[in-house]
């Protein structure tokens, strides 16, 4: 965290200042050859690098904390949708089973052909279609959770971009599927979870930009220590 960083940075700065003071006293003692001048420059470069690293690490800590918080909230929303979809899939399957049971009884009676056809139409056009959509809702919610976990570990800008494009596509489909939930209470619950997932791309900076910034900071820190 930032407190630990500040404490460690202060120790390094104090050591660097001690080195600078030592070199200064060496000059005062009359040592002033080229090697000492070179050490002076190395000391100044070291101090400048330490300050730059400290600034970058401070930025990294803040960005990392922000990303972790946003991903945690979005993972909770994705898991909530997945849990909700379990109930919706079960309800849809129960509805389809009930219609199939009725259909089995109807087809045994010749004088109820029209009712049989109506039941078959409902099974195909409503119950099975609803079950398919709820299955997809569960699948997309689970995939969204996996993508969010992958984002926190993404190691290249291209990987972040791929996750962003894939996740945004998933969220668009999830939004359509949640709007198709017939139960108003569960539809409202799903809508609240979707608000969090939609904000993934809407915030500025969003989670993808934050991850890209972290990768850039890592590259800058790496270049300083080379």
Each predicted region: which residue ranges?
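Membrane-proximal N-terminal soluble sensing/regulatory segments of transmembrane proteins
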Residues: 1-48, 52-196, 206-222
């Amino acid at each position: 965290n930032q407190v630990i960083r500040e404490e460690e940075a202060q120790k390094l700065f104090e050591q660097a200042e001690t080195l600078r003071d030592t070199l200064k006293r060496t000059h005062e003692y009359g040592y002033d050859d080229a090697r000492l001048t070179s050490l002076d420059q190395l000391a100044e470069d070291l101090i400048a690098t330490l300050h730059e690293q400290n600034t970058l690490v401070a930025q990294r800590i803040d960005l990392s904390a922000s990303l972790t918080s946003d991903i945690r909230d979005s993972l909770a929303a994705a898991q909530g949708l997945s849990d909700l979809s379990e109930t919706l899939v079960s309800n849809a399957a129960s509805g389809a089973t009930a219609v199939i049971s009725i259909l089995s009884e109807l087809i045994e009676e010749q004088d109820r052909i029209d009712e049989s056809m109506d039941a078959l139409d409902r099974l195909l056009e409503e119950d099975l279609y609803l079950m398919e959509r709820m299955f997809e809702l569960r699948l997309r919610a689970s995939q969204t959770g996996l993508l969010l976990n992958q984002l926190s570990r993404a190691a290249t800008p291209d990987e972040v971009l791929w996750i962003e494009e894939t996740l945004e596509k998933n969220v668009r489909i999830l939004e359509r599927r949640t709007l198709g939930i017939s139960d108003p209470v569960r539809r409202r619950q799903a809508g609240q979870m979707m608000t969090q997932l939609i904000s993934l791309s809407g915030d500025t900076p969003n989670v993808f930009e934050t991850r890209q910034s972290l990768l850039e900071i890592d590259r800058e820190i790496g270049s300083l220590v080379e």
